[in-house]
Amino acid sequence: MKRGLQLVLMLCVFLLGTQVSFAGGLLGGTGVSDARVYDSEGLIKIQTLAIADSIYNGPTSEGEPEIDDIPEILMNGTLVDKKNVLNYISYREVCQNIKIARHIDILRLDSRKAFKEYKNNIGLYADAYVITTISNGTSMNDGTRLNVFFDVYNARTNKIVYAYRKLAPKSAVRDSLLYTEIAKDFFSDFIDAQKQAIEDKEKEDKAILKLEKEEAKKAK
């Protein structure tokens, strides 16, 4: 009887573990990540995040997303924000707004001029923008692991606020699913980082208030 219960418990644990693995989108995971907050005050103030044009030279292996697929993949990544903590605006939407307001079609400019116009105008539409840089080597067989960098900049000062990097497993299949899951990982971690920054600020404010009250009592 005891042995039977142990087997049932082991099966439940196995099934639960399998469910969690698939819930992440990929059984093998999306790799290792690291993140850094450069400006916690700026991070707290972000309510609208714009998805800027990505830096990507195109697929180097079969099944990898095309350049034109990346904007949709990044926007699909925002779906992880089920509580709508942030507002998101796509690159094309920003370009359309600039075209209407400034009569400048960014989509027709070369990458350098387009980025300059984007930086000069993005502050009208968002609090921050994220630039995604994809480093995928020359082929899947060249030994290079997929590296994806997400750098978030203040839309008004263009100073970096937050950086996130994902290093995919060497054996990972570089398809749209992997890229989408990596995007979801970024947005999820970004939201968590903002939440943590808010909590830290609240604790700091309470500590300062407590100290001020203690100093006021001593002064009486």
Question: Can you say where each PLM-predicted feature lies in the sequence?
Answer:
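Bacterial N-terminal signal peptides that target proteins for export
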Residues: M1-L9
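Bacterial N-terminal signal peptides
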Residues: V8-Q19
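Short, charged, low-hydrophobicity "junction" segments
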Residues: T18, A23-L26, K99-I106
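C-terminal/domain-edge helix-coil "capping" segments
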Residues: A23-A50, L109, N120-L124, S139-K220
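N-terminal segment of the mature soluble domain
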Residues: T48-I51, G58-G123, Y129
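Solvent-exposed loop/turn segments at secondary-structure junctions
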Residues: Y56-P59, E93-Q96, S135-M140, A168-V173
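Hydrophobic beta-sheet segments that form the core/acyl-binding groove
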Residues: T132
